[in-house]
């Protein structure tokens, strides 16, 4: 099978709620200079000259569209840039390059004041339910804070009524509003975080590994709650996770990240059935399967993930790629996302 050259994977569909174009997020750091050989141990280098500037390329040149009403899963190993991308899309982190559009409005360079009316339409559910809630605020104050900031309620009584309604929607009793976060379990705290995210009736929610810190027995409850809320409120999700089974269950489409770049993007069913990128194939081979007839042979990748400070030239995955007899382009030419015969987009020189 051959690629279809006419298709442009970067062409935004008409129903795209969020459009990301060539977005990068790099963090400047300073590295220690290597100590000159032969320098006596008692000789100390000046701090001004003992460190050299460097850049962590957390997210690089990402193109992505999130369609209205869908759940786009974002998967990859820890440290690949998933959470950084989610926060950059919401402008919680400032992009180093590229453009971000929300509902056809370019928000990339908007001032915080101009962006404020859009904030209520874009929310985030954080990974750690223990750290994302202010321990000095009651649950009611934490949920109702956004209502006051965006002037969505006219009185304290209206705010209390709205908070009680939100608590009921996430399966908590109204009297929880008078209690503090430390009085709740992890699963209950995450429900509070979800209620807070829904307070302003958003259209787009970034779910940043919302179940990774929870017990397995609680994870399914939170996923089912998110699905019910999406159906009721017509929400659009970016669901970030490293749990491939959960992502398969909840997602309409799935994007796979490696070292700050999207390497594959496809409908969930197609990606899990016939992954095209060698990295995606290796990821899915590690997913446990109950039925021995559906088990894949485990693909073991050599070495470690390269440093995002100095990513490899060409395809960043080539030092670990299990494909034999790789073409020269893998070592020298950066692969771009291209549409394959089945509609999957893959950034790979050998994928078909």
In which residue ranges do the predicted regions lie?
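Short catalytic/signature loops enriched in Gly
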Residues: 3-4, 10-16, 30-50, 55, ...
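P-loop NTP-binding/switch modules centered on Walker-like glycine-rich loops
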Residues: 18, 206, 210-214, 218-296
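Conserved ABC ATPase "signature" region
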Residues: 23, 37-47, 105-106, 157-175, ...
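Conserved ABC transporter NBD signature motif
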Residues: 98-106, 118
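Hydrophobic anchor residue at the start of the ABC signature
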Residues: 143, 194, 218, 222
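Conserved ABC ATPase signature
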Residues: 180-184, 188
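A short, proline-enriched helix->beta-strand linker immediately N-terminal to the Walker B motif
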Residues: 199-203
